[in-house]
Amino acid sequence: VKKKRIILPTDFSNNAWNAIAYALTIFKDVPCDFFILNSYQVGASGLSTKMAGANDTRLYNLIKEQSDRDLKRELEKIKSFDKNPEHTFIARSIPDNLVNAIGKTVYREEIDYVIMGTKGASGLKEVFMGSNTYKVIKEVDFCPVIAVPDDYQIEKEIDAILLATGYEHLFENYELKPLLNFVEHFKAKLWIAHVGSLDALAPEQKASKKGLKNRLKSIDYEFIEVEKDTSVNNTIQQLVEKDKTIDMVVMINQNHTFFERLTREPVIKKVSFNSKVPFLVIHLFE
């Protein structure tokens, strides 16, 4: 069995730790290589003098040492939390912005998932990790990302997963794989929610739904039709609120999904900020 390779970004905040603990818990029986990644940037001071250059270098070295030190501490914490001998942990301290640091690592290390919190050290959701998580979802569009809400505690296995879709394209095996990994591993129920008007589906939507049926032969799934509430995001949140068994929401991100055309609503962005349960975004290679 090929080990799963997973990036866990951290800014050493409680929220970052919460996402790490979540990842270690859901993959507790799966052999994994975890890349614990901290990125940092030293802003140029704008003075093009030798002194400024020397200051930047000094600052850079200080920040780098701090990052290495904090990562070492984080690894010790992880190893006391996670005793699985089939889990390997690799610390990466990278002098770059978060999106680049993650993107390059995904590419070089053939990463399967990026799992990160939705709130960073600042505590304001839209600041740091908040907007960063969305940036990672948007820019690192060649790797599935799981955004873990800041106060989310996993209490049990994953019972049910909600895939929200507009049946806007024919599903390919590669895009369903990151979702089916969880469904199969946890023997979870898969709810496939079509959110929109309850009018009859267009022919291409029917084809998409039929294709999905063929791909899901061996698993426990059910289709549901949901009338769109004020927004797709609200509708999804209400479904999760109502059905307490849903432990993960999944969406496939196309450049402009059916949802976004239909509603002019940046659904993925909204759900990534508002979801009460972990949110898996899978990208479509167009």
Which residues make up each language-model segment?
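Charged docking surfaces used in two-component/phosphorelay signaling
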Residues: I90-A101, S231-N233
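A short, acidic, amphipathic alpha-helical segment used as a generic capping/interface helix at domain edges
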Residues: D229-K242
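A short acidic, glycine-rich active-site loop
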Residues: N55-R69
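A short helix-to-beta-strand connector/capping loop
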Residues: S80-I90, K217-I224
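Small/aliphatic-rich secondary-structure junction motif
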Residues: V1-T57, A160-V226, I246, N274
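Conserved N-terminal glycine/acidic-rich loop preference
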Residues: S67, I111-V114, I154-G166
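N-terminal, Lys/Arg-enriched amphipathic/low-complexity engagement segments
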Residues: K72-E76
